[in-house]
Amino acid sequence: MSQELDYLSQEVALGRGSRRDFLGRAAALGISATAANALLASAAHAAGPRKGGTLKIGLQGGAATDSLDPALAANQLTFHVGRMWGEELVRLTLTGQLRPYLATEWRSSPDAKAWVFKIRKGVQFHNGKEMTPDDVVATMQRHSGPNAKSGALGIMRSVDSVTRDGDSVIFTLKDASADFPFLLTDYHLLIQPNGGNDDPKAAIGTGPYKIVTNEPGVRTIGARFANYWDSKARGHAEQVEITVLNDSTARTAALQSGRVHIINRVDPKVVELIKKAPGVTVQSASGRGHYVFNMFANTAPFNNNDVRMALKLAMDRKDMVDKLLRGFGTIGNDFPINASYPLFTALPQRPYDPDKAAFHYKKSGHTDTILLRTSEVAFPGAVDAAQLYQATCAKAGIKIEVKREPGDGYWSNVWNKQPFSTSFWGGRAVQDQMWATAYITGADWNDTRFFNPAFDKMVVAARGELNQAKRKQIYQDMALIVHNEGGVIVPMFNDTIDAIGPKVGGWIKNPNAELMGGMATAECWLEA
């Protein structure tokens, strides 16, 4: 039986999907009605969400500088906390399709320059106010205004205006965009009362949990919201408590002792050890996530493409993947797209070539030591990765100084601030969203300072191209530009590796992001 049918049967059992749609999809896959109904019955027996208890989660990624303003969410902690209290108009399913959330349906104009979203009625904010299309308009305007500071600013720059039309909201775009609804899955775009303009850090949203305690860098607690609009499908625990456990050993110990029920970012080197703990299950999924070494392409010495090329050629990707990921990932190729994305085209793999790296480095004229900043919060094994890289660079005559930065404050003081550092990306729903978020001029999260007017024009052209073959070619050309000229080194695409204790129910493997694509806080429950 396909993974898709397993997933869809659980969705029906949990009240999040339609039995009719499931049977239709099963028939399309050649599954008999008898077999399909048996699968549904099995899922219904196993599903049965239980209400109550406190679901405890230990996460790497939190810091004292974390904000509850969704516009500023920049790490795993703020992503998962946002999923507790807030919701977007649409979200991704396990199979990469769009699922209605605060919007019930959508349609586009024939030229794909205007998109109309019908807003769900009867949804209440945590402050008792009913959500209206005006709140949606204000939210989108806050993330796209001239003074906006938002991780979604790159994708929102394509929006010319957002207006209300009765029960709907109309997005008028500057250029055609065939994938525009997918962009609205961005986790920064949580709908807030009056768009969050009154108090963006109040964490007042429409999600299943209302924030009752928030100690940045320590813990966040959400209590089940009594008037949540979809309580059958989500919000099963009475409370969800997220504790920041940035140290990998401490996080693992907390799960093994039962102090927490779920942890993220399991280091591949301890997977076999964790599996031996009674009742503990390791959950891994391959997807779009990738680990990166970011160079500011507008800052010396990285503003010289020979330096950038030398540093790319000095990366032994296979060795790094073998030693760090241990089978939980694949080799990267210096652009952020892999086969998980539609319209992907592979490029010839860049080899580890210290001689060629030395050639480009000598050609650049640079001879000084290059400072690389890293931290274990950048990604599991980031410090080890930096040291491996230091050694392979040395073989090309490139001197790298590795500076290990504190985890607390890394995302506010180092990432997107310092010219050479390690980081990670969880990937995005579609190629346009990934490119627009981090690679176009003007994007707040352009963490390689890659500014290329020709590339920017290609992003716009691909966005509006309805001929899939032509669009695929544009994406290939874009990938080649970043591969050869960009400031990003992508050594690997990582699997997400989480671990859950014996009391956790409702877990469904999801490739979109760690912890069930960010849905574990809302959709998991505690078994008796």
What name fits each language-model region?
Residues T93-Q97, L184-G235, Q239-E241, D247-T249, ...:
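Gly/Pro-rich hinge or "lid" segments in bacterial periplasmic/extracellular proteins
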Residues T104-K149, I170, A254, P301:
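Aromatic- and charge-enriched surface segment that lines or borders ligand/interaction sites
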